[in-house]
Structures are given as structure tokens and as C-alpha cells.
């Protein structure tokens, strides 16, 4: 791989360094996971066996979930948990609470992380999981502050402004000590290309493990192709297709937050529909699940 990288860098001056790095990351991950992702045809018997094993795992697990619990009972009952290779779209208009819901799910999954050692020295997640959170809109510091506020029940604006008393300060300090080692990894790089996002997710899985990816939000991820003639719809379609491919490759669920178009605001009935997905393209085709965040009280207050 090193010789190939050196040769390409020497002979192809047009190739951007970032693309070379992404290509090498892909090759390294493929080498580490040799045989686990591209296995070709499997017999129907093997597929049946795997499906029965999934059902057995759900039967043995508390709550009867075959996937990772979101921490929200009603949602888990509808989805049966979040399953490996699923692309889950969480969409809504601004101020509906998309990021708040996503951070709550991420925190719950990371907080419940349990694993067991395997005979070959690797670890297997038995509950919860390691979370990779790509926050393209909010900084890691802002995200952490939001989690601390949720965990302690102290309003976020009070923490930001420093208008807390000594007791609340102690609560915050104790909370930080309790949750600082959770397996929740935040990447707050803005305008991240989908190729770089995938490379970083592979690296995280290789170094720390990975059970859930969250992307906040879909429309802020950029195309890796940068072709002048591509429309924004084509770019977003490329992103969703690559996120679905990444979910299958890493065998983890991917939650991608998405904005909705302004058409929602012009209707009398503000409840979102699939057609409201902003720059939708192939979002609904690539997604396994599409969920909408809707708060009727928000519109009544206005």
C-alpha cells in the first residue's frame, strides 16, 4: 500500500492529497476486515441461520430488541432497535429538536455500552455501543454542554452564562467525572466531504470500535467529486448513497439528520411528509427508515 501511495503521488500530480489519504484509509480498512464485508454469494441456509441468530439474540436480550436500543421505548417498539447497515433519516424543520433527540440517543447508547472479550482477543458489544458523532453544525464544546445540561437538569443558558450557584457547580463537576469516559467520539469539522467522513469512521472503528454513526446534518456534508455541473440534489443524493454504503460496510446503523423544505410552513397542515425532504433526490429511496420530528405546540405558540 505504501509503494502504491508513493507511486501515485509521484506520477499523478492532479490527485489531491486528501483523496490519496481517503483511498489509503479504505485499503487499510479492507485489509483489516478482509473477508468480512465482500463475501459474495451466501447460501439460503446460511442466511436463514443468521436470521435465526438475530432473532435468538433479541429473545435473550432484555426488551426483546434485535438492534441497538435508542433509549426511547416507543421508538424501540416500532423499529425493534437500530440495526446494523440501516440508514435512518431523522428530519424536521429548524427548532423542532432534531439535534436534541440525536444527542439523547447518542448519550444513551454510549452510557449503556457493555462488551465481552472474545477467544480471539477482540471484543463484542453486548449492550449499547461506541458512538461516532459527526457534528457539522455545532461545535464539540456546544454538544458537550448540551449533554451536561440534559444530564444534570440545569438549564444550558445558566451554564453558558455562569449564573449557577455552588450546589449546581458541584453537580456539574460530578456529572463530568461520571460521563467523561463514555465511548462517545465527536468530530465537529465543518463542510466535511463524504469521502473524508467515511475514512474517519473507518479509522474510529479500527482504533476504538464503532456501533453507531450520527451525522448532524445531511445537507452540510459535501460531495467528494466537486463536479461543476452537479446540482445540489445530485450532491445530496451522492451523500445519502455513500452513507448507506458506509452503514453496510461497517455493519453499523447510521442516523443522518435532515432539513425539510420551507413548503411545510406554507401549508395549513404543518405535519411533515416525505415530499418535504429538502433536496430530497434519493433520500427516501436510500433510507431504511425516515422519521420526522414535529412539535404542534411550536406552531400554536407562533
Where are these regions (language model features)?
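Cytosolic-facing regulatory segments adjacent to core modules
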Residues: 77, 112-209, 223
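Phosphate-binding/switch region of NTP-binding enzymes
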Residues: 76, 118-123, 234-302
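Short hydrophobic/aromatic beta-strand immediately N-terminal to the Walker A/P-loop
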Residues: 88-89, 132
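Walker A/P-loop NTP-binding motif
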Residues: 104-112
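Hydrophobic positions on the alpha1 helix immediately C-terminal to the Walker A/P-loop
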Residues: 101, 105, 143
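The Walker A (P-loop) glycine that initiates the GxxxxGKT/S ATP-binding motif of P-loop NTPases
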Residues: 92
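Pre-Walker A adenine-sensing motif
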Residues: 71-81
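Short, small/acidic-rich helices and loops at N termini and domain boundaries
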Residues: 1-61, 85, 96, 128-129, ...
